[in-house]
Amino acid sequence: FVVKAGEEEYLPYGYDTLVAEAEKNDRLYRAYECKNALSIGYTYDSYIPEEKYAKMSTVEKQQALLQGVILSDSTVPETIPEFNDREVPYKLVTGSGCREKDGKLIVTKENAQAKLVFDGLDECETYLITEGVDYEALSPRELISDKKWNKMTLYEQKKVQYENSTWRYWKESQKAYIDVTGQFLDKTISIFTDKYNAYSGRSDFLCNTGYSVKGKKSITLTFENTGVYSYKNMKVVCQPIENIESQTTKLRAESLENVEIKNHELTGNISVSKDKVLVISLPYSKGFQAYVDGQKTELKQANTMYMALELKKGTHEIRITYCTPYLKAGLVLTCAGLLCYICVVLVYKKKRGSKKG
């Protein structure tokens, strides 16, 4: 994980070993290694069905991935994951130019702030989770309260009315940004509405405000744009890290060894003390083919994006090859098309020669 020197607070939990430094554009960057990192091939002794995993929250999913492999089905036992995340109550304190009404935050001044005040837990990562977020811009007239409007001169009112006539709701309501600050960290939530040409439908966000030994006390939201920010749910969740080391140690205990990758092929060997599932940290694709002890073996899609092999107790030789899907069929069809073209040209030339004769 690479960060600018002096900004180590952006490092996720566990990235505490400095392995390299480099300078670019007069800035020093540092690369840190995670002590709990898993190898390219690690093993599980239990699984979690995909349909159950799909119903979990984002915070639950990251905990589940350390307790069981995610598969549609498996021969290893199913496990029921345990979760230790805690939602903590908070008080929302709004600043100048920002007010809360009917579950919405109405911002009438750029860079207005709201603060979530809470008692966070020690030795935790603290998350701000927002669901169903949407944004609507406010017109120049809507930014002015009735009390202030009545005090304005006729000229000032006419000026605002003119600005209002040229203002376009669909254009101004396309996107907005919220800066999230948790003690030292500063991150940004980018909101793109259905009026934006690159709208993706995303309205739920999880912002990790970082790990801290002492519990955090507040999270500050800074609204770069004026407008109405609505949300269905907003919560602060603390994720203790007490189980991470023991869980990753278990996954690393029996891993793929003597790994070699060359010529579209990965090889290695592994010994497992009981029936297990070996996860290969390569993106799943139908182009991969696996062989265990020389026997062709089914590769399963695991943990959403990776590949997995079911292994029996014992020592095994693993070989995984890759060939681009439909590459051979494509070559055959290309050659066939080329032959057809040559035949057409030859027939055409022969007919043309016959006419001249």
Task: Report each predicted region and the residues it spans.
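Active-site-proximal, structured, solvent-exposed surfaces of multi-pass membrane proteins
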Residues: N84-G357
